[in-house]
């Protein structure tokens, strides 16, 4: 059937730069398709036309009936299927090898320029340049595709998936699923319907079902690989978008600074600084006691007659020592009233205790 070594060497290179599912697909292609097709299936269809017997002596009728029964041999059809399905992978391999060569040349040029700039010595590429130049990375021993190489790889999977579906549908339309033992031919130049018999139909049916199952498995692996690459790409985008949103929600350096608000004009009348820098309620027992004392003195003064020649009473308050918040001093007249030396009793018609003590 030919030498498969050339195709095998190329597919081995593809195997090095593929994902895990892609490596499984290549294993299925090597073992279950190329190996089985080259060893067992070819021997079953080797005597296909010679053992195709028809019950007629009409010249040319047997060839016409064989062409009607088998428009293309199963072996040749499967060989074409393998070639067309493997071609996208070969294109991807060519692109990968070209990319590797270009990267090596670029690194050599950069190294030569660095040596010329520094005079001598080895040059090591920074990590950023390596990531920028390479089209894949090795993470934990696995190759992570990225960039244009990833796009080429996805396109190769799409093309081989389309080819796989086309060849499966074509085989079903040409032959169906199983071969019949008896084939009735009604083509010219056969004078009447001619019965033709297929050799070893059961063995051929086994190989046909096996190759269809392998094709379905390869199609499933291709779809699984597309799903794997697409899901991983979407997950990376979601992770990047989540990180971007988290960075946007982080407070800036000036967000934690609390701005001091300007208090209202009468704020100091409501709050006073107590001992230790704490605020306490100004309406304490001290303030209440002082207010009661003032009210009592005012009532006593208002109960007396006014002094002639004076329109109002002059009241003088003296500073009192601070009384603790919990203590309430007794009700007594302020010092201003006790030390007042004016003779209010002479101007009043009422008798007072001061008038009797001369």
Curated annotation (Swiss-Prot):
Stored InterPro entries: Connexin, Connexin40, Connexin_C, Connexin_CCC, Connexin_CS, Connexin_N, Connexin_N_sf, Cx40_C
Domain of life: Eukaryota
Membrane side Cytoplasmic: residue ranges: 1-19, 98-164, 227-358
Topological domains, Extracellular: 41-76, 186-205
Transmembrane segments: 20-40, 77-97, 165-185, 206-226
Membrane topology annotation: Multi-pass membrane protein
UniProt keyword annotations, A-Z: Cell junction, Cell membrane, Gap junction, Membrane, Phosphoprotein, Transmembrane, Transmembrane helix
Region Disordered, annotated ranges: 318-358
Record GO terms (molecular function): gap junction channel activity involved in atrial cardiac muscle cell-AV node cell electrical coupling; gap junction channel activity involved in AV node cell-bundle of His cell electrical coupling; gap junction channel activity involved in bundle of His cell-Purkinje myocyte electrical coupling; gap junction hemi-channel activity
One GO BP: heart development
SMART domains: CNX (SM00037), Connexin_CCC (SM01089)
One term under GO cellular component: intercalated disc
Compartmental location: Cell membrane; Cell junction, Gap junction
Residue positions, PTM Phosphoserine: 353, 357
Family affiliation: Belongs to the connexin family. Alpha-type (group II) subfamily.
Quaternary structure (record): A connexon is composed of a hexamer of connexins.
Reported function: One gap junction consists of a cluster of closely packed pairs of transmembrane channels, the connexons, through which materials of low MW diffuse from one cell to a neighboring cell.
Protein known as: Gap junction alpha-5 protein
The organism of origin for this protein: Canis lupus familiaris (Dog)
Highest classification ranks of the organism: Eukaryota, Metazoa, Chordata, Craniata, Vertebrata
């Amino acid at each position: 059937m030919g030498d498969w070594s050339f195709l095998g060497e190329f597919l081995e290179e593809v195997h090095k730069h593929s994902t895990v599912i892609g490596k499984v697909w290549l294993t299925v292609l090597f073992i279950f398709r190329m190996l089985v097709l080259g060893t067992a299936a070819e021997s079953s269809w080797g005597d296909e036309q010679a053992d195709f017997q028809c019950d007629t002596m009409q010249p040319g009728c047997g060839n016409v009936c064989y062409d009607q029964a088998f428009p293309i041999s199963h072996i040749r059809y499967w060989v074409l299927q393998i070639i067309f399905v493997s071609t996208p992978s070969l294109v991807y391999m060519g692109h990968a090898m070209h990319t590797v060569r270009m990267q090596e040349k670029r690194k050599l040029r950069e190294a030569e320029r660095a040596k010329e700039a520094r005079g001598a010595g080895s040059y090591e590429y920074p990590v950023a340049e390596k990531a920028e130049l390479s089209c894949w990375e090795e993470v934990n021993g696995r190759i992570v595709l990225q960039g244009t190489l990833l796009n080429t790889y996805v396109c190769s999977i799409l093309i081989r998936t389309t080819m796989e579906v086309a060849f499966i549908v074509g085989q079903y339309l040409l032959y169906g699923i199983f071969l019949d033992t008896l084939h009735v031919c009604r083509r010219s130049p056969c004078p009447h319907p001619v019965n033709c018999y297929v050799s070893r139909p059961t063995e051929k049916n086994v190989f046909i079902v096996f190759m269809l199952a392998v094709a379905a498995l390869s199609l499933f692996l291709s779809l699984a690989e597309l799903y794997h690459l697409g899901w991983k790409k979407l997950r990376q985008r979601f992770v990047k978008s989540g990180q971007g949103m988290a960075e946007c929600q982080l407070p800036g350096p000036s967000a934690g600074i609390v701005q001091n608000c300007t208090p209202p004009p009468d704020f100091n009348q409501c709050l006073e600084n107590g001992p230790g820098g704490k605020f306490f309620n100004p309406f304490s027992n001290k303030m209440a006691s002082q207010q009661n004392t003032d009210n009592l003195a005012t009532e006593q003064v208002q109960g007396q007659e006014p002094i002639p020649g004076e329109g109002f009473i002059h009241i003088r308050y003296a500073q009192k020592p601070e009384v603790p918040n919990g203590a309430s001093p007794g009700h007594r007249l302020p010092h201003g009233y006790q030390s007042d030396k004016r003779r209010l009793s002479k101007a009043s018609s009422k008798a007072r205790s001061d008038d009797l003590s001369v």
